[in-house]
Regions:
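Motif-centric detector for short Cys/His coordination patterns
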Residues: 1-91
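Active-site environment of non-heme Fe oxygenases that use a 2-His-1-carboxylate facial triad
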Residues: 55-57, 61-108, 113-287
């Protein structure tokens, strides 16, 4: 029922009725479960290992354990734990795995000893996969320009935020490559938004529920492209297991609140509290 090369299912499950059931079943000589179905004169064979792996009874009875290693401002004292040498990633599989584990479990990694030529980040990025193209083009320079079409292209300090919350599918990972840092300022800050969400979940469930259930509108109005982009999304979105999927937070690109009048007060206060915590030194780290 599957294409031998692509392994995509070739058979149309919609051709089967809702009332199909096994007519006969047994373990065959190869140790596979053999089922003769009540329709279509069809016999299926299942590996026991596949059945065990896809047993929804077992899976959904097991306690889910999040893979994420949430962190707070105390990470700043041990910031070298998220450092990794550029050459280690480029030259070894072990270095690549270490980098991927930092990104997956911690959500952040600082790569040092990187080359400073333009476009020199691509070899290390391509160790993971291809880069995702956006209308900003790839790569794009974050520099101070006259008449900027984005706050990133100004000399103003930026608040903690997630980029492109008005995308239907915001970036999973973003990579910032610092080529020059000789100007005044240039300090960086980072915050584990999942850790802040977890704090609210444990200490202010009403705020947490508001942030996970009531969508906010984000928008981008770019005068250079005659384009208005907008999307509704919750500040915190969850997976089917109740773990964290992503966070949308950006005071610069959040549009006017658009929700039921009865919800307006709690939405405003919940988002305000979330934003305050995302900038609290208890949760964020700073580095240069």
């Amino acid at each position: 029922a599957h294409d031998k090369d692509s392994r995509h299912r070739m058979f149309n499950i919609l051709d089967v009725s809702e009332n199909i059931n096994p007519k006969k079943y047994n373990l065959n000589s190869d140790g596979k479960l053999e089922i003769e179905w009540s329709e279509g004169n069809h016999v299926s064979h299942y590996d026991i290992s596949w059945l065990r792996e896809n047993c929804y009874t077992i899976k959904n009875n097991e306690e889910y354990k999040s893979p994420y290693q949430l962190w707070d401002g105390s990470l700043e004292k041990n910031i070298h734990s998220i450092y990794i040498d550029h050459n280690e990633i480029i030259s070894s599989e072990e270095g690549l795995v270490k980098w991927l584990e930092l990104l997956h479990y911690k959500g952040i990694a600082i790569v040092y000893n990187a080359p400073v030529e333009k476009n020199s980040a691509f070899p290390v990025l391509n160790r993971i996969s291809h880069t995702r193209e956006t209308f900003f083009k790839t790569p794009f320079e974050v520099i101070n320009i006259p008449k900027p079409n984005n706050s990133a292209y100004t000399a103003h300090a930026l608040q903690n935020h997630m980029d492109l919350p008005w995308f239907e599918n915001p970036p999973g990972y973003q990579f910032l490559h610092c080529l020059v840092n000789s100007a005044k300022g240039g300090d960086s800050s980072a915050v584990d938004a999942f850790a802040v969400a977890e704090y609210l979940k444990k200490n202010d469930k009403d705020t947490f529920d508001t942030l996970t259930k009531i969508p906010l509108k984000f928008r981008d109005k770019d005068y250079t492209q005659e384009a208005h982009r907008s999307f509704y999304g919750t500040a915190i979105s969850l997976t089917k297991d109740g773990d964290y999927n992503d966070v949308r937070f950006s005071t610069a690109t959040m549009d006017a609140l658009d929700c039921h009048p009865d919800q307006m007060d709690k939405v405003y206060k919940s988002h305000h509290k979330f934003g305050k915590l995302l900038h609290d030194d208890k949760f964020q780290i700073k580095f240069r």
